[in-house]
Amino acid sequence: MVKIGSHVSMSGKKMLLAASEEAVSYGATTFMIYTGAPQNTRRKPIEELNIEAGRKHMEQNGIEEIIVHAPYIINVGNTTKPETFQLGVDFLRMEIERTSALGVAKQIVLHPGAHVGAGADAGIQQIIKGLNEVLTPDQTVNIALETMAGKGTECGRSFEEIAKIIDGVKYNEKLSVCFDTCHTHDAGYDIVNDFDGVLNEFDKIVGIDRLQVLHINDSKNVRGAGKDRHENIGFGHIGYKALHHIVHHPQLTHVPKILETPYVGEDKKDKKPPYKLEIEMLKNGTFDEGLLEKIKAQ
């Protein structure tokens, strides 16, 4: 069975239960959450995450493993503002604690960081420093470094940069990788015509065993654009065929696949989630040209 799901919302009083219910309504077999808003530091205490009820619902619906995404505000690549770096370190420690408390997530996806003008090498060294401050030998969750598109001053735009970070970290057995299809395509890798070649390259440079999460997104931009703008499955420059191949790749069957595709609709206040129909389409093997209209009609 393919492990596939999407980003879902953990909110209200139900929290983890709400996230699981939303995922199940999409026909998902895994899902990804933020433990609070991705753009700020406000967090409900662990006791209010409704973990027990959420886990029970997951168990009843055959969901064994979920993914946590660290908030965007963490930037341990920042060399110019010590307070930004320190916030990132402290907050990442807290996210590890919160993710461990969930008991059903083994991976926290992290955007490695941005060097904010100091240069990639300086940024990478700072990320290594931050991860060395955060990681402990007895933690039960991994930090999954996300492959980035190369927008602005992002670090992690190539497999070599990801490998350099991993190699510099003391407890690097606690590091894994989240392979984002849109980001990797936008960074210049030909996942459309030669995904197997790209995967082999990843294996040589980073090691395929570290690939523990997949973000499945189409891209609004051509390969190598360095933009990072997600598109709905089959409606971008990667296309349905390539994404279906990746989702069902025999070397990646155990890896959770998470959709982060955009909501659909002209009215900003009434956009519809695409995940139920996109998951269905990726499972059944046939591209549906009328998908966006069907999503709007939900």
Curated annotation (Swiss-Prot):
Zn(2+) 1 binds at H69, H111, E146. SMART domains: AP2Ec. One of its GO terms (molecular function) is DNA binding. Binds 3 Zn(2+) ions. Its cofactor is Zn(2+). Its EC number is 3.1.21.2. GO terms for biological process: base-excision repair. PANTHER family: APURINIC-APYRIMIDINIC ENDONUCLEASE, ENDONUCLEASE IV ENDODEOXYRIBONUCLEASE IV. This is Probable endonuclease 4. It comes from Bacillus cereus (strain AH820).
